[in-house]
């Protein structure tokens, strides 16, 4: 069975927007942990637009935060970018339910874990993610921040079938140089996971990738939800994470679902585990909890669903407290995935 997952770099325009939105969120929570934040971002060329709802004792300097994100990513001439903000207070109707400890919206959220990697994450997704992290760490004067990676893994043969990376580069860099650098990263990542290096390697298949970032594509928050999670290996409820404070169950419940799935796999209850939590706006308890172990369970799925409800406080307030979600640096979640990073409480 061939399965493909992708990841995008911190310089991808959609990820630039996610990072700006989470920079605003983190700044608000640092100054006022009770902040209610729902920020969206759009970037095109050198123009940034932020819009959303914000109720906080702190008013963030969105322009300065956006410029700091661009500087950290390594965007050329980041000082020339302009920004505009259209932000109002949170709706009183939404606030009424959240103030009582209820969910900030309806919806279903998924968490997943698998024993196929040390990170308890899908292997092709981790390969794509590790490759882009290595590319980021290696980045020289030859390469620019925008990049994407895609890995096709053959689960029956236990080997990498295809490794694809497209990376932005300077105009004066020869494509042969780019291919040598990127191919070296592919091999390095494959060997780190004890895998074959005789895969099909595709580097910048169009032959040239000079114009990138927001000058090549418009970026918007919430458009890389599969790259944020599990690379397509499990289902997704559709809700994005970045720019949302933890009262939004789109974010907090997805983190708790990951923790439960991870705990169950570590406990030996299953080799693969997908948790679904579903909520109604304004209500504290989930309306349903579902466990799917894809036939790998050692404990009945119904019993695992009951265990999840007994062992974990699944109210929004309980999740926030258990995972310390008002103290998380969300800047570190906004690129290269929200899961499989050991520094976060939902990975512990």
PLM features: what roles do these ranges have?
Residues 172-264:
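Glycine-rich anion/phosphate-binding loop at the beta-strand->alpha-helix junction
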Residues 44-45, 270-272, 276-348:
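Internal helix-turn-beta structural module
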Residues 19-23, 126, 130, 252-259:
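Short amphipathic alpha-helical face segments that pack within enzyme cores
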Residues 4, 45-47, 64-212, 332-335, ...:
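Glycine-rich, mobile lid/loop segments that gate access to catalytic sites or pores
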Residues 38-56, 281-285:
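Short, charge-patterned binding micro-sites
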Residues 30-31, 265-271:
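Secondary-structure transition/capping motifs at alpha-helix termini
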Residues 1-38, 43-44, 125:
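N-terminal, positively charged regions that mediate nucleic acid binding
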């Amino acid at each position: 069975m061939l399965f493909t997952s992708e990841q995008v770099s911190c310089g991808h325009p959609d990820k630039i927007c996610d990072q700006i939105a989470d920079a605003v969120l983190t700044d608000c929570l640092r100054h006022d942990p009770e902040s209610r934040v729902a920020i969206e971002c759009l970037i095109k060329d050198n123009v940034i637009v932020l819009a959303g709802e914000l109720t906080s004792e702190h008013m963030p300097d969105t322009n300065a935060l956006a410029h700091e994100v661009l500087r950290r990513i390594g965007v050329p001439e980041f000082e020339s970018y302009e920004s505009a903000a259209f932000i109002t207070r949170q709706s009183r109707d939404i606030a009424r339910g959240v103030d009582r400890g209820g969910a900030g919206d309806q919806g279903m959220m998924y968490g997943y874990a698998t024993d196929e990697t040390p990170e308890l994450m899908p292997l092709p997704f981790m390969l794509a993610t590790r490759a882009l992290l290595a590319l980021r760490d290696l980045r020289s004067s030859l390469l620019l921040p925008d990049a994407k990676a895609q890995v096709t893994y053959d689960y029956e043969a236990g080997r990498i079938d295809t490794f694809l990376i497209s990376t932005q580069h300077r105009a004066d860099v020869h494509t042969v140089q780019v291919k040598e650098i990127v191919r070296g990263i592919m091999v390095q990542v494959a060997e780190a996971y004890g895998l074959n290096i005789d895969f099909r390697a595709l580097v910048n298949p169009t032959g040239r990738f000079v114009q990138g970032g927001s000058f090549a594509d418009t970026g918007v928050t919430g458009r890389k939800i599969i790259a944020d999670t599990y690379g397509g290996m499990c289902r997704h409820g559709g809700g994005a994470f970045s720019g949302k404070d933890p009262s939004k169950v789109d974010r907090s419940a997805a983190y708790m679902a990951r923790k439960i799935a991870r705990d169950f796999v570590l406990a030996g209850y299953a080799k693969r585990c997908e948790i679904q939590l579903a909520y109604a706006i304004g209500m504290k308890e989930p309306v349903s909890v579902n466990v799917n172990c894809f036939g790998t369970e050692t404990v009945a799925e119904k019993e695992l669903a009951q265990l999840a409800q007994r062992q974990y406080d699944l109210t929004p307030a309980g999740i926030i407290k258990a995972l310390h979600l008002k103290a998380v640096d969300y800047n570190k979640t906004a690129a290269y995935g929200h899961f499989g990073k050991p520094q976060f409480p939902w990975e512990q």
